[in-house]
Amino acid sequence: MTEDGFVIVYTGGGKGKTTAALGMALRAVGYQHKVCMIQFIKGSWHYGEMDSSKRLTPEFELIPAGKGFVGILDDTSPKEEHERYAKEAIETCKEKILSEKYDLIILDEINYAVHLGLINIQSVIELIKNKPKKLDLVLTGNH
């Protein structure tokens, strides 16, 4: 990545935010950089990124940290359970960021987690403030 890392935000309506971040990840892995993607909304059910990430190890680590989509796709979990998972995801982010093991960390759907009230904006600001200088940090999600 770069000598001074960036904070990049992909937001807006429609599709393409996660895809853009994955494009950055693929490029980084091509340069033998270490990448971690922490997904705030997607749960552990099977989806394409899981299969792709296995092919990119050890340079790419995917952590599906969410409980799953909130209030859709047959979700019956109480909001408090989604909040607990999101708060645990924030702790995972802190650990990964402070480990200085990664060149690029993607916080997928973190913006949407804030919008839904699963985490507060201050916790996101703290992640940004505490990132190592060389780390590229990508935040995705609508809102």
Give residue spans per PLM region.
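Positively charged, low-complexity intrinsically disordered leader regions
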Residues: 1-2
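Conserved P-loop
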Residues: 5-95
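Proline-centered loop/turn at the N-terminus of a beta-strand
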Residues: 34, 134-136
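Short, polar loop motifs at secondary-structure junctions
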Residues: 142-143
